[in-house]
Regions:
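Hydrophobic cores of alpha-helical transmembrane segments in multi-pass inner/ER membrane proteins
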Residues: 37-47, 103-117, 168-177, 235-253
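Hydrophobic transmembrane alpha-helical segments in integral membrane proteins
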Residues: 6, 18-44, 91-103, 234
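Hydrophobic alpha-helical membrane-insertion segments
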Residues: 192-207
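Short, intrinsically disordered terminal tails adjacent to the first/last structured region
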Residues: 1-15, 263-277
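Membrane-interface helix-boundary motifs at transmembrane edges
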Residues: 55-66, 90-93, 118-127, 181-190
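A glycine-rich, hydrophobic loop/mini-helix early in the fold
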Residues: 76-147
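Membrane-proximal helix-loop-helix units in multi-pass membrane proteins
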Residues: 118-186
């Protein structure tokens, strides 16, 4: 993996490509860099596995093709976002702010995937407990963000020492997933958890945007939230935020499907009785 990244960086720094020279990586400890990188790859791999697992009763060739397409699309997204950050093309001070554009594209992509037929397939083909449990990635992620704050990469308000309480989503995801696995009918608990997770996610997204070096900046303490324009930190919005948004949308759709199924059940049971009378 290190060799692959080095080759990509070398390619991007080739003057014949007419790209900017590679920007220096924001100073961070090797442990933080590789734990961040590893978690992003794990989340990407989990998405591909989920696509394959949700194939259900489709033919083997169709399931294989869908999995390969998901893997190719995911790998392309990872490579493009990393390459853009490594090439220095992402910035919050340019007009338009290219880093902000990328974040907006990521959010739009997440909503598109979550509300698509693929999102519906994930909602119906993956157990609710698993859909909730995968959001536990936000616990180690928040530990990394706190470490990033301690190392001077990002402002305090984006960590749990400030106003970011999303670590509660990651911790509670484990508990709620285990509870749902034992009591599949406890959808009210899942509904409350999902709503709370969305609120906490919206909170940190708002704080992050208002901490960027743009005209709408509200938090003026240093450093500004511009580290996500660098590699590999660009994967914070491009991978982790996207995964969180897709996850919440898919869980919402799963809960809606189950609510509709419960509404239809009494009517289906009453139909034979009415016919017999």
């Amino acid at each position: 993996m290190k060799l692959l990244i080095c080759k990509v960086c070398t390619l991007l720094s080739d003057s014949s490509l007419n790209l900017p020279r590679l920007v220096p990586m924001v100073n961070a400890s090797p442990g933080l860099i590789w734990s961040f990188f590893s978690l992003a790859i794990a989340i990407a791999a989990a998405f591909v596995v989920a696509v394959h697992a949700s194939a259900g009763h489709t033919t083997c060739s169709s399931a294989r093709r869908g999995t390969l397409l998901a893997a190719l699309a995911t790998a392309t997204w990872l490579a493009v976002t990393l390459a853009l950050a490594a090439s220095g093309r992402l910035s919050f001070t340019s007009r338009p702010p290219t880093a902000g554009v990328l974040i907006a594209v990521g959010v739009g992509l997440a909503i598109a995937v979550g509300t698509s037929r693929l999102g519906a397939r994930l909602a119906t083909g993956i157990p609710l407990a698993a859909l909730i449990g995968v959001q536990a990635f936000r616990f180690p992620l928040e530990l990394m963000l706190h470490r990033a704050y301690r190392e001077g990469l990002m402002p305090v308000q984006m960590s749990y020492s400030g106003f970011n309480f999303d670590i509660l989503t990651g911790l509670s995801a484990i508990v709620v997933a285990l509870y749902i696995a034992r009591r599949p009918n406890a959808v009210a608990v899942a509904r409350i958890w999902n709503a709370a997770g969305i609120v906490l996610l919206a909170n940190i997204l708002t704080i992050a945007v208002l901490s960027t070096p743009t005209p709408i900046r509200v938090f003026h303490n240093e450093p500004a939230n511009e580290w996500i324009a660098h590699a590999p930190w660009v994967w914070l919005p491009a991978v982790f935020v996207v995964a969180a948004i897709v996850g919440h949308i898919v869980i919402f759709r799963r809960l809606r499907y189950e609510s509709r199924a419960r509404e239809r059940a009494p009517r289906a049971a009453a139909a034979p009785s009415a016919a017999a009378s």
